[in-house]
Curated annotation (Swiss-Prot):
Keywords: Amino-acid biosynthesis, Cytoplasm, Diaminopimelate biosynthesis, Lysine biosynthesis, NAD, NADP, Oxidoreductase
Residues engaged in binding NAD(+): 10-15, 36, 100-102, 124-127
Reactions catalysed, as given in the entry: (S)-2,3,4,5-tetrahydrodipicolinate + NAD(+) + H2O = (2S,4S)-4-hydroxy-2,3,4,5-tetrahydrodipicolinate + NADH + H(+); (S)-2,3,4,5-tetrahydrodipicolinate + NADP(+) + H2O = (2S,4S)-4-hydroxy-2,3,4,5-tetrahydrodipicolinate + NADPH + H(+)
Family according to the record: Belongs to the DapB family.
Matching InterPro entries: DapB_C, DapB_N, DapB_N_CS, DHDPR_bac, NAD(P)-bd_dom_sf
Enzyme active site: 157, 161
Enzyme class label: oxidoreductase
Annotated GO MF terms: 4-hydroxy-tetrahydrodipicolinate reductase; NAD binding; NADP binding; oxidoreductase activity, acting on CH or CH2 groups, NAD or NADP as acceptor
Signal sequence residues: none
Protein name in the entry: 4-hydroxy-tetrahydrodipicolinate reductase
Gene Ontology CC: one annotated term: cytosol
Source taxonomy: Bacteria, Pseudomonadati, Pseudomonadota, Alphaproteobacteria, Hyphomicrobiales
Organism this protein belongs to: Rhodopseudomonas palustris (strain BisB5)
Chief location bin: cytoplasm
Single GO biological process annotation from the record: lysine biosynthetic process via diaminopimelate
Length: 271
C-alpha cells in the first residue's frame, strides 16, 4: 500500500514542528503539505528545516485547497478559527482530519459535528496514550465514588499556552462527569476568585497554572472525608502527542465518515 500523504497545519508552531519530525521517523506516512497562517513570515520556508531536519522540499503555504488536492489527511494543531476553516475543506475533499486544537467553543464543536456525515474527523484534547488511559481510569474511579468525594482537576502548562482550562483538563472533566452520569456543563466550577461561597456538592472543579516550559501536567484529585485519591499524568515531550496524532490518522484512513476520539483509536472506549 502507498504511504498516507499528510498535511501538517500550523507547520511553524510547536506541535507542527514536532509532527514534521514524527512523520519523518514513521513508516507508512509522508509529508506532502505544510500549512501556515496567511501573512506568516514563515510562508515559503522548508518544513524540514523548520523542524530541525534536513530540507524535505515541502514549503509552507497558506492555501489548503491546493495542498489538499493530493492528500489523504491533515493533522491540525492550530487555533480554533483556522481549524474551523480547515474542517470545511477537509470535508469537501473527503480526507482524514485529525484535530488536536484546543480552546474550541461549543459553536465550533457544533460546526465540526455538522460535517461528520461526510468528513472523517478524529478529535481529542490530548493524543497521548497516557492521558487517554488516565481519562478511562478517571471515569472508572468517578463511577465508584459517591459525591462525598469532591473532584478537582489541576493542570499546568508552559507560559505561551493561550487557552484555559486545557483541552485535556476538559476531557478529564468529561470523563469524571460520565463516570458520575451527569452533564459537565451543569456541574463545573471554573475560575474561583474572591468570596466564592463553599464548594457545591457534585461540582467538578478546574484550576489552571501557567509558567516556564512545562509540556503538560494534569492531576485528577478525588478529595473525600479524611482521604484523597490522586491520578496524574506528566507529559515530558510533545512527541507523545505527535505520534498519537499519526496513529489516529493511520487508524482513520479508510474509515467511514464520522466523529471519532482518541479513545476509539486506542480501543479504550469500553475500558
Ligand atoms: N490534542 C493534543 O494532543 C495537543 C493539542 N495541542 C493544541 O494544539 C494547538 C497548537 O499548539 P502549539 O503548537 O503549542 O501552538 P503554536 O502557537 O506553537 O502553533 C500554532 C500554529 O498555528 C498557526 N496558525 C495560526 N492560524 C493559522 C491558519 N489560519 N492556518 C494555518 N496555521 C495557522 C500559528 O501561526 P502564527 O504563529 O503565525 O499565528 C502557529 O504556527 C493548541 O490549541 C494546543 O492546545 C497541543 C499539544 C497537544
Ligand atoms: O497547548 C499545549 O501545549 C497543550 N495542549 C493540550 C491541552 O490543551 O490539553 C494538550 C497538552 O496538554 C499540551
Amino acid at each position: 500500500m502507498s504511504d498516507m500523504r499528510l498535511i501538517v497545519a500550523g507547520a511553524g508552531g510547536r506541535m507542527g514542528r514536532a509532527l514534521t519530525r514524527a512523520i519523518s521517523e514513521t513508516k507508512g506516512v509522508v509529508l506532502t503539505g505544510a500549512l501556515e497562517a496567511p501573512g506568516s513570515e514563515l510562508l515559503g520556508q522548508d518544513a524540514g528545516v523548520l523542524a530541525g531536519l534536513p530540507a524535505n522540499g515541502v514549503k509552507l503555504s497558506a492555501d489548503l485547497w491546493t495542498l489538499s488536492a493530493g492528500a489523504d489527511g491533515i493533522l491540525d494543531f492550530t487555533v480554533p478559527a483556522a481549524t474551523i476553516a480547515n474542517v470545511a475543506i477537509a470535508a469537501q475533499r473527503g480526507i482524514v482530519h485529525v484535530i488536536g486544537t484546543t480552546g474550541l467553543s461549543s459553536s465550533d464543536n457544533a460546526v465540526i459535528k455538522s460535517v461528520t456525515d461526510q468528513a472523517i474527523v478524529v478529535k481529542s484534547g490530548n493524543m497521548s496514550l497516557g492521558v487517554n488511559l488516565l481519562a478511562a481510569l478517571t471515569r472508572r474511579v468517578a463511577q465508584s465514588l459517591d459525591a462525598g468525594f469532591d473532584i478537582e482537576i489541576v493542570e499546568m502548562h508552559h507560559r505561551a499556552k493561550i487557552d484555559a482550562p486545557s483541552g485535556t483538563a476538559l476531557l478529564l472533566g468529561e470523563a469524571a462527569a460520565a463516570g458520575r452520569k451527569v452533564d459537565l456543563d451543569d456541574h463545573s466550577a471554573r475560575g474561583r476568585d474572591g468570596v466564592t461561597g463553599a464548594r457545591k456538592t457534585g461540582d467538578i472543579g478546574f484550576a489552571s497554572l501557567r509558567g516556564g516550559t512545562v509540556t503538560g501536567d494534569h492531576s485528577v484529585i478525588f478529595a473525600g472525608p479524611y482521604e484523597r485519591i490522586e491520578l496524574a499524568h506528566k507529559a515530558e515531550d510533545r512527541m507523545i502527542f505527535a505520534h498519537g496524532a499519526l496513529k489516529a490518522a493511520q487508524w482513520a484512513h479508510g474509515k467511514s465518515p464520522g466523529l471519532y476520539s482518541m479513545m476509539d483509536v486506542l480501543g479504550l472506549a469500553e475500558f
